[in-house]
Regions:
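Alpha-helical promoter-recognition and RNA polymerase-docking modules of transcription initiation factors
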Residues: 1-69
Length: 69
């Protein structure tokens, strides 16, 4: 994973602070989402990877927050 994608994860994770997970836990959940996005992304679609990845990152972070509660 390159630095730009890591910055994307950090940016998305920032919106979920103070919801029960530490910053490190949010980043870890976001990285899982980024991995899923990389596995499932089909480059021949009209969707840009960044838009696709944000959805996966958010879903994994939300799920981690739900699992913690």
């Amino acid at each position: 994973m390159n630095e730009i994608n890591q910055r994307l994860v950090a940016s998305v994770a920032k919106h979920f602070e103070n919801q029960g997970l530490s910053h490190e836990e949010l980043i870890a959940a976001g990285n899982r989402g980024l991995q899923k996005a990389e596995e499932h992304y089909k480059p021949n679609t009209r969707i840009r990877f960044i838009a696709y990845a944000v959805w996966w990152i958010r879903q994994c972070i939300i799920q981690a927050i739900k699992d913690k509660k």
